[in-house]
Amino acid sequence: MNILDKEEFRVKLGQINKLVETQDYKGAMQIVDSIDWRRVKNVRTLCVVGEIYAANKRYEESKEIFLLAYHRAPIGKNILYRLIEVSLKMGQISEATEFFDEYREVAGNDNSQYILKYKIARAKNASLNEQIRILEEYKEKEFTERWSYELAKLYYKAGDKQKCLDLCNEMILWFNDGTYVMKALDLKQRMGVLTGEEKEKYEQRFIPKLIPPEKAQEIRESKEAVSYTHLRAHETAANL
């Protein structure tokens, strides 16, 4: 790049970063497409570009950019992680497996290897028991909301309702609230084992999203009316 090219690149890079901050990945991609990234040496910048392409589901370009970044920084485990994920998105399981082998060489003690191993197993349509075994190994190392819920789902699919219930209860106890706790409550709802308090929490979160607000209010009022009628019936019986 000459001096003018560098200045133009600096301006465009600033625009890209601003668009990424606002999660306008389509807008960012329009600028990204106007630049020859083979001439860029900054690994962080290349990784941002790779993520922009991935966000727009242009996985071929994303993979090419991540490979450029990897060649600039061959010990970058995070780049390898994304190369594995993008390769899986493209259905290139054998390449993902090769990248995974490299990942284990540079990050053999990283618990994330279990997540990657699980994603590869899932892409290979491995048995539910195999997928469960991998996530159980991960859970022994690290207890996280997302992957605990994923494991609970696998238990549910495998028909092991007791393990599913136990794990959902463990998640609710440890994390109390949040996206995956609500998903755990949804699993319990499917099994018909919500407690009274959990049912109230579940309905407050999910019913307004599943049906129009006015219908949700109508259901709540109907339930209140039923409760009131039930209470009055008991009072009447007590006075007889």
Regions found by a protein language model. Give the residues of each.
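Solenoid-like repeat scaffolds
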Residues: N2-I3, D33-V40, L67-P74, D101-G108, ...
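Generic helix N-cap/helix-start motif at coil->alpha-helix transitions
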Residues: L4-L13, R38-L46, R72-R82, I93, ...
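Structural motif corresponding to the intra-repeat A-B loop/turn of tetratricopeptide repeats
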Residues: T22, N56, M90, K124-N125, ...
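Alpha-helical adaptor scaffolds
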Residues: E51, R82-G91, E98-E140
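Conserved small/polar residues in nucleotide/adenosyl-binding loops
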Residues: T229-T236
